[in-house]
Curated annotation (Swiss-Prot):
InterPro entries: COP9_N, CSN3, CSN3_C, PCI_dom, WH_DNA-bd_sf. The modification Phosphoserine is found at S407, S410, S423. The keyword Protease does not apply. Belongs to the CSN3 family. PANTHER family: 26S PROTEASOME NON-ATPASE REGULATORY SUBUNIT 3/COP9 SIGNALOSOME COMPLEX SUBUNIT 3, COP9 SIGNALOSOME COMPLEX SUBUNIT 3. Pfam families: COP9_hel_rpt, CSN3-like_C, PCI. Component of the CSN complex, composed of COPS1/GPS1, COPS2, COPS3, COPS4, COPS5, COPS6, COPS7 (COPS7A or COPS7B), COPS8 and COPS9. In the complex, it probably interacts directly with COPS1, COPS4, COPS8 and COPS9. Interacts with CK2 and PKD. Interacts with the translation initiation factor EIF3S6 and IKBKG. Interacts with ERCC6. This is COP9 signalosome complex subunit 3.
Length: 423
């Protein structure tokens, strides 16, 4: 091993033993060029370091190995990274979260290139758990995990990291990029859409669209298109975006989504044949955007919406009559829709198989059973918790030096602008 590398190993050992993590971070940041020049000796360096005791030194070596233009032996490097992430010292790597997250990004990109996304899911889950200070903290690796889960069509491993509400962002020593935030909510929305949890999907797309921005983001644009489609499926109309949404959404993103606005406009007429014509007209756009599946679900949801409208007018109706009123192909298709809607709790009805008549019923829920009371209790607890969090955030902002300085400056400006009463 070259003398400079020996010195690197000795310094890593010494600083780790002394617990001088800040100085160790400075060392590994300066040593990138040295390690890159001695690529053939890096496995020897890894052998001389202990993953638990010298986590930051091992991290620096693996990061450089993965940064090379071509990885000579990917399988060996993959095994080394897998072992490192599962056994490294979490307290140590929190001093270099930027490099640790960078290693995870490199691993993700390599697995995406090799079309092996499933292999990285378990590793990234461990990486997030090592980085997070608490389960409500968002890291840039969350977006990587969601990307791999989407590509592998294996959604459930991501759910524990999506079902929690994020209250904090891991700064990663200033390396956290807005792209990771947008991707987390965009990919998360796609996962929830795939699982047909449209309410949560809509919330995730909304977070991506309403992120403060000064320029058009392609991720925001794609989120906006899916937001329109999921809104129609879930609510039967496009949900209005909050007032704090950036002006670039109205100025630039909306004009780039004309086909989707036309779809929403035709959807509001409740006419399936017109909607089918519009889908055919813009089929190339919807297919190119990979949204044709969602567009077809919009068409299906319009049939359901029209069936729900019939429940407000009729007590009983034949399947044949329903099919003609809703513009379905026949009584068989009408029966299929009604059965699915009964199963999903979208309507309350029964079908008489003898005469093919559908009877509509009132909602049997009386809102007085123990399960319903438990749900109300849970919702109240969430509101109380939210109130406490808002108070804590308000207190945090109030004592923030930058906020205090800015507030004092504003007050001085106001007093300076007031005319003197003695003039």
């Amino acid at each position: 091993m070259a003398s400079a590398l020996e010195q690197f190993v000795n310094s890593v050992r010494q600083l780790s033993a002394q617990g001088q993590m800040t100085q160790l971070c400075e060392l590994i940041n300066k040593s990138g060029e040295l390690l890159a020049k001695n690529l053939s000796h890096l496995d020897t360096v890894l052998g001389a370091l202990d993953v638990q005791e010298h986590s930051l030194g091992v991290l620096a070596v693996l990061f450089v190995k993965f940064s090379m233009p071509s990885v000579p032996d990917f399988e060996t490097l993959f095994s080394q990274v897998q072992l490192f992430i599962s056994t490294c010292n979490g307290e140590h790597i929190r001093y270099a979260t930027d490099t640790f997250a960078g290693l995870c990004h490199q691993l993700t990109n390599a697995l995406v290139e090799r079309k092996q996304p499933l292999r990285g899911i378990g590793i990234l889950k461990q990486a997030i758990d090592k980085m997070q200070m608490n389960t409500n903290q968002l890291t840039s690796v969350h977006a990587d995990l969601c990307q791999l889960c989407l590509l592998a069509k294996c959604f459930k491993p991501a759910l524990p990291y999506l079902d929690v509400d994020m209250m904090d962002i891991c700064k990663e020593n200033g390396a956290y990029d807005a792209k990771h935030f947008l991707c987390y909510y965009y990919y998360g929305g796609m996962i929830y859409t795939g699982l047909k949890n449209f309410e949560r999907a809509l919330y995730f797309y909304e977070q991506a669209i309403t992120t403060p921005a000064m320029a058009v983001s392609h991720i925001m644009l794609e989120s906006y298109k899916k937001y329109i489609l999921v809104s129609l499926i879930l609510l039967g109309k496009v949900q209005q975006l909050p007032k704090y949404t950036s002006q670039i959404v109205g100025r630039f993103i909306k004009p780039l989504s004309n086909a989707y606005h036309e779809l929403a406009q035709v959807y509001s007429t409740n006419n399936p044949s017109e909607l089918r014509n519009l889908v055919n007209k813009h089929s190339e756009t919807f297919t190119r955007d990979n949204n044709m599946g969602l567009v077809k679900q919009c068409l299906s949801s319009l049939y359901k919406k029209n069936i729900q409208r019939l429940t407000k007018t009729f007590l009983t109706l034949s399947l044949q009559d329903m099919a003609s009123r809703v513009q379905l192909s026949g009584p068989q298709e009408a029966e299929k829709y009604v059965l699915h809607m009964i199963e999903d709790g979208e309507i309350f009805a029964s079908i008489n198989q003898k005469d093919g008549m559908v009877s509509f019923h009132d909602n049997p829920e009386k809102y007085n059973n123990p399960a319903m009371l438990h749900n109300i209790d849970q919702e109240m607890l969430k509101c109380i918790e939210l109130d406490e969090r808002l108070k804590a955030m308000d207190q945090e902002i109030t004592v923030n030096p930058q906020f205090v300085q800015k507030s004092m400056g504003s007050q001085e400006d106001d007093s300076g602008n007031k005319p003197s009463s003695y003039s």
